[in-house]
Amino acid sequence: MWLLPSFGIVMAVTSKPVWLEWTVVSLVKVLMTVTRLIPIRWSRALGKGVGRVLYRFNARMRRVAIRNLELAYPDWAPDKRRAVARQSVQSTAELLTEIGPLWSGSWSKTSAMLTVEGIEAVTEPLASGRGVIVLGPHLGNWELLGMHLATLGDLVALYEPLALKRVDRLVHRGRQRTGGRLVPTTPRGIAELVRSVRRGGITGILPDQVPKDDKAGLNAPFFGVECFTATLAYNLIKRSGAAAVMGTVLRTPTGFHAIYRATEEGVYSDDSLEALTAINRGVENLIVGNEAQYQWQYKRFRCRPQGPVDHYDWLNSPLIDEGRVSS
């Protein structure tokens, strides 16, 4: 399920007047056009600039990122956590400014900037007729990950329609431009996805997204911290018999680098908690060494039902030392 960047402007105006929707669509199109016409290094510089502003003025985003890094890396010095938190916000903003060349630019130009590691983890199961489920966390450019997967086989991905219909059409066109197909996040859509994977197709799932429904996950360790982990990917793997693969697309100085790795065997366990723990471990392995490109602004360490510790209860305090370990 490839989602729009979590701080996306369109999400904030889903119930606003039509004129505002037109304004948002126009701004998005202008941004896409500008970033499509300029070199990738310039669009990234623009994203970093936006990220610096967000980090400076969006206290909640900054505090969540620092808090998550405190939980994941308690041994890091406060200065290092703050630096990585700032880089993380900039990385998320870069994703927004990279959308233009990805959704409306030349795919041949984009693919020429993409190097790939471990592609056999995807192509070998497909060649044998087995479907593939790629688990791609909020790391690097997950939009490009979905687009690249669509060039490797028949991609069907879950998609939650946006209330802004014009923006929804824009997103659809962009995400399907390399041949992928989007289905709604409904029982019928999930059934269609499972059928496609059983026939030897591909899908992509964000394994580190916290579901709202208490019945849609289990609390499993992530960087040693118990947090709510979705069972969607696990259930799809069990229902479809697909091969599970970890995947990400990271930024490099000259473009992008895709990484595909077969998951550990624990992902296929009949014990759902063991499987979710293995999935989280796979996400950790992708993040380590690439922490600055992970979306730490997301409240990943939530528990459901609410556990004995709320890792984010202190965020509302007006007085806070953001360089202090606050656990």
Predicted regions and their residues:
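Soluble or luminal CAZymes and related metallo-dependent hydrolases
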Residues: S26, M61, L114, T185, ...
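Catalytic core of membrane glycerolipid acyltransferases/transacylases, capturing the structured
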Residues: E94, S128-P187, R199, K212-P221
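Membrane-anchoring hydrophobic helices of lipid-metabolizing enzymes
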Residues: L3-G136, D168-R173, R177-G179, E322-S327
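Short amphipathic alpha-helical segments and helix-helix/interface helices
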Residues: I119-T123, G146-M147, D168-H172, L193-V194, ...
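Non-catalytic C-terminal accessory region of glycerolipid acyltransferases
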Residues: S6-S15, W19, L54, R82-V89, ...
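Generic structural "secondary-structure junction" signal
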Residues: R56, P101, V116-G118, N141-G146, ...
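A conditional alpha-helix N-cap/helix-loop micro-motif detector
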Residues: A112-V116, L164, V183-P187, E226-C227, ...
